[in-house]
C-alpha cells in the first residue's frame, strides 16, 4: 500500500515540479532580458547589397489596387517567343525593385513565358502604409499584397485561365508560397533563398543565448520547444508593437501539394543556413526537389550556377506550367542514385523535369 501512495504522490508532484521549473526558468531568462534580446535581434536588418534594376524597354508598367486603398507598382514583361507558354509571378527580394527581375527571367522571356514582377507596399514605387516599416520577415501585409498581385493577373484581359507559376527570391518567395497555399491558381513554384519564421529563428536563438548567458544548461540542455515558446512570445510582442502579423510558412508549405515545388538554396548562405532551408523543405509534401548550389551565398545562386540555373528553372516551368505538347525532348532523372552517379536518361513523348547533376534530392519519406 505504501508503494501505491508513494507512486501517487510522485505522479501528482511531477507536474507541479515541472511547472515550478518552468516558472524559475522563465524568471531567469526574463531577468537576463532574453526575450528583449530576441525581439531586438529579430528586427535587425541584414547587411548586403540589394540589386535594383532600371526600367526595361517594352515593359508594361502598371499600378494595381491593394487593400487599405493602396496602389502597388509592377511591370508586365511579354515573351518574345511566337507562342506564350505560361505566365509567371515573380516575387522580389527584400528592398529591391520590380526591374531587378530581368537577370532571373531573361531566359524565361525568350522561351515563351510572360513575367509579372511587383513591389509590395513601402517598397520601390508602390505606395506606403503609414506607420509600417517592413522587415526582412514576411508579414500579413506582404501576404495580402501578393494576393492582390494574383488577383491583378486573374483580371487582365490576357489572363491565363489555367493559372500561373511562381518564381520568388528570398522574402518574395516566402510571401508567394504563403499566398499560393490559399490559391490553386498558382500551379507550381520555384524559390531561391526562401525562409520561414521558426525554422530560421530557433537555430539563431540557440546561437544568441551563448552571448547572453555562460550557463551550460541554458546553452545545451534546453529543449527546442523552450526556444519555440520564447520565439512565439517574442513574435507576439513584436506583432503588437508593429501592428502586424507574422504568418507561419512552416504550416502553409504543407498545403502546396500536389503542385510541384523546386527549392534552390546556396550552400554558403550565412544568413539562411542550408540546414534551415532543408528543415523547411522537409515540411513540404511531394512532389518536391531541393537544389543546393555549391559555393553560393544568400541570393547568389544565379551568379554561381549561371546557365545551369537558368536552364533548370526554364525546364521546371516547361514541365509543369507550359502545355504538354511542347516539342522538346525532356531529360528525366531515374532516381536519386542515378543522380549521384551523374546519369541522365532521355525520354521522348512526355514532359519531365531536367535538373542539374548537382540537384539534391531528399528521400521520399522526408
PLM regions: where:
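An N-terminal hydrophobic leader/cap segment in hydrolases
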Residues: 6-64, 75, 355
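Catalytic active-site module of serine/aspartate enzymes centered on a nucleophile-bearing elbow/loop
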Residues: 305-345, 351-361
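Hydrolase active-site cap/lid region
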Residues: 181-245
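Conserved alpha/beta-hydrolase
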Residues: 108-129
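Catalytic nucleophile-loop/oxyanion-hole region of alpha/beta-hydrolase
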Residues: 124-157
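Alpha/beta-hydrolase fold nucleophile elbow
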Residues: 159-169
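The serine-hydrolase catalytic nucleophile loop
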Residues: 94-107, 120
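Serine-hydrolase catalytic core
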Residues: 229-314
